[in-house]
């Protein structure tokens, strides 16, 4: 029972970490990476389709993404979708689409850093809420005399260690993201 509570809680904490990673991948750092265009939807024969299903997105150099449509007739639609995605990007179109990354100003870097810190704090709060739920489940088992006080204390210590591990991971990922953001 205790093991199930810990496994369930740890799985939920892992999902929180994955959500943070996904959010961080969308925060612009001035360096090109394909994850920046993940949310772009292209009108493909009238229906909205994710960009990665109609084109391959690769890094051409550190400041340029190369978008190669699978169907040459989609070039204009992809160009339009990238412009309308409100990412602050201006694609250059030919047979392929090149998306240069604009240089980030100091103010933009600070805004992005603030956004990253906010997301990290939301993830920390989420981790703590999961810990609270796990602790409540353990206390409920102890109250119903299904586990001993020693088991309760041991499980609480284990849950705290798991929580600390995930909070530390969030902090290290935030630190790495801030370093990326502030690198000129």
UniProtKB/Swiss-Prot annotation:
Keywords: Cytoplasm, Protein biosynthesis
Molecular function in Gene Ontology: ribosomal large subunit binding
Subcellular location: Cytoplasm
Gene3D superfamilies: 3.30.1360.40, Ribosome-recycling factor (1.10.132.20)
Family of this protein: Belongs to the RRF family.
NCBIfam families associated with the record: frr
GO biological process, alphabetically ordered: cytoplasmic translational termination
Protein name listed in UniProt: Ribosome-recycling factor
Gene transcribed to yield this protein: frr
Top-level taxon of the source organism: Bacteria
A single cellular component GO annotation: cytosol
Protein task: Responsible for the release of ribosomes from messenger RNA at the termination of protein biosynthesis. May increase the efficiency of translation by recycling ribosomes from one round of translation to another.
Main location: cytoplasm
Organism expressing this protein natively: Psychrobacter cryohalolentis (strain ATCC BAA-1226 / DSM 17306 / VKM B-2378 / K5)
